Amino acid sequence: MLKLFSAFRKNKIWDFNGGIHPPEMKTQSNGTPLRQVPLAQRFVIPLKQHIGAEGELCVSVGDKVLRGQPLTRGRGKMLPVHAPTSGTVTAIAPHSTAHPSALAELSVIIDADGEDCWIPRDGWADYRTRSREELIERIHQFGVAGLGGAGFPTGVKLQGGGDKIETLIINAAECEPYITADDRLMQDCAAQVVEGIRILAHILQPREILIGIEDNKPQAISMLRAVLADSNDISLRVIPTKYPSGGAKQLTYILTGKQVPHGGRSSDIGVLMQNVGTAYAVKRAVIDGEPITERVVTLTGEAIARPGNVWARLGTPVRHLLNDAGFCPSADQMVIMGGPLMGFTLPWLDVPVVKITNCLLAPSANELGEPQEEQSCIRCSACADACPADLLPQQLYWFSKGQQHDKATTHNIADCIECGACAWVCPSNIPLVQYFRQEKAEIAAIRQEEKRAAEAKARFEARQARLEREKAARLERHKSAAVQPAAKDKDAIAAALARVKEKQAQATQPIVIKAGERPDNSAIIAAREARKAQARAKQAELQQTNDAATVADPRKTAVEAAIARAKARKLEQQQANAEPEEQVDPRKAAVEAAIARAKARKLEQQQANAEPEEQVDPRKAAVEAAIARAKARKLEQQQTNAEPEEQVDPRKAAVEAAIARAKARKLEQQQANAEPEEQVDPRKAAVEAAIARAKARKLEQQQTNAEPEEQVDPRKAAVAAAIARAQAKKAAQQKVVNED
């Protein structure tokens, strides 16, 4: 009958499936009041102590900071962190943090100055006059986060609740063994906790406020009832001790009978839950104006001489707290951050205390039992019976081990609260929670990669669409900016295009010549004749210019005559070289000799005509004669070298000798004409006479060597000798005259 009446009572409670009853081990630490810990010399404050992104730094190395001074800026979901004491920022660098793998995260390292000075604190005792938005912003900027273990920013959680929250639940269950931080906080600070609950209720305006606490905390229950004696707006619900009654979904079901849907949140059913420690931090932030710089931490385990609960500054090294509590480590000492079921072993003791650190457990070697070897799953289903989330841990174990992420997701692995109840009851000692944590991390990484790929695809498609729009707009501008030509311009353009097309058609049209017909090349012939006539006219003008220049300058005329004679001799050599085996025609040679003599006479006449205008310098004439004689000698040598095997024609040699003698006479006449004005040096004349005699003798020797096989005509030889003797006599007479 009593059970029937209790079912209709207003404070009815429900029970969830599964759960376990491990040894509580709470009496080690809940019997002593909260105490302060001496300040450490150095504090390490990680920038990320919550779920979400880290804040933006607002301090630099070397800055002096005070307790409560912001070290980062909280924008959006980024929660700021604050200096736990006054001191100097000595470094901003990665440091190992509270993580199973001791991952390094960016941290601010502060050396304490020992003064522990606060920033100016501005409390809002009249918080009821403040708006909801102002209170949420203050809570957020003062760094308040969920202190029950999740670390979700409280301001963001309150903002997301909105006006749809009907029930505010304060979680005071603290169901995990060894942990007594909330129990001791409620015993020592019950009034402040209730005041923080009222601030949360003022922000959310719920229909009911429930405090859920397990029946294994009688002192805390007594203190809360004493504070709530005159209050009807807050209801205290004492629930049976069962692990994990402190889970958000489990406690919600116990107090309201409502189940949070798979993949959903408690706010979907009009429920919002906050921890006891969070309510206390809200009170200190709003009323006292103090950012969260410390929290209650349980120090327990048989390896600690003075177990209890302490106010630990955030950023304090774990080693400092344990040493203050009389830590006596063994050879293979293990230190667990958190409880024995949901906590993790610290790889080393220099990691700092953060906002989610609620317990430091240092058990002795035999306190938690000997670690046993993992064995194969026997499919006993004991884990499924103990699971408070109604999951199938054995199936999730196989899926996690086989990397079957889709099947693990289908079996709601995301609903696992990692309470460790399945691993506690497993007879094969399988660390199921470790497999589930790893699998959830891999699934989260895959989803994050898919999200980045989708965002990249969206950015690419948006960029392509933007480029297409810009291209279309650019083409439209070009079309609108194009100027349409007038009618007259259109006709001119059309005519020009027609001419171009006609020329292209003519150029590409092949020339076809029918059989028996002659091509009409009259145009080409006429153009060629015109070009020839133009060239002849230019040549005639050039010749007239050259003739006028030659008549005006007797020296140039003499040079041209010498060039002509050299060309004649070169032509004779080329003909001799081109016909080595052919007999020279004597008639042709005589004709060429006559032509050469005619050219020589013509040049002499030109010189004679030019002489009246300008008197020739006898010295220059002598130099030119010497040059002519040198050229004659060089030509004779070239002829001798070019025709070593060829029989020399005696007639041709006689002609050349006659030409040479004529040149000599011509030079002598020029010298005689030049003598009246200038006396010739007798020594030079004697030298020239000797040179002439030597040349004559050399010519006779060449003729003798060139005609070894042919009989020399005695008459011609006698004539040549007489001529040579006459030249010698004449030179001697000239020498005598010069000497007189």
Swiss-Prot record:
BP terms from Gene Ontology: electron transport chain
UniProt KW keywords: 4Fe-4S, Cell inner membrane, Cell membrane, Electron transport, Iron, Iron-sulfur, Membrane, Metal-binding, Repeat, Translocase, Transport
Keyword Cell membrane in record: yes
GO CC term (a single one): plasma membrane
Keyword Translocase assigned: yes
EC category name: translocase
Domain of life assignment: Bacteria
Amino-acid positions noted as binding [4Fe-4S] cluster 1 in the UniProt annotation, renumbered to this chain: C377, C380, C383, C426
Main subcellular location: membrane
Positions of the UniProt region annotated as Disordered: 602-718
Cellular compartments annotated: Cell inner membrane
InterPro entries cross-referenced by the UniProt entry: 4Fe4S_Fe-S-bd (IPR017896), 4Fe4S_Fe_S_CS (IPR017900), Ion_transpt_RnfC/RsxC (IPR010208), Nuo51_FMN-bd (IPR011538), Nuo51_FMN-bd_sf (IPR037225), RnfC_N (IPR026902), Soluble_ligand-bd (IPR019554)
Domain 4Fe-4S ferredoxin-type: residue ranges: 369-397, 407-436
Membership in a protein family: Belongs to the 4Fe4S bacterial-type ferredoxin family. RnfC subfamily.
NCBIfam families (UniProt xref): PRK05035.1, rnfC
Functional summary from the UniProt entry: Part of a membrane-bound complex that couples electron transfer with translocation of ions across the membrane. Required to maintain the reduced state of SoxR.
Quaternary structure annotation from Swiss-Prot or TrEMBL: The complex is composed of six subunits: RsxA, RsxB, RsxC, RsxD, RsxE and RsxG.
Name the UniProt record assigns to this protein: Ion-translocating oxidoreductase complex subunit C
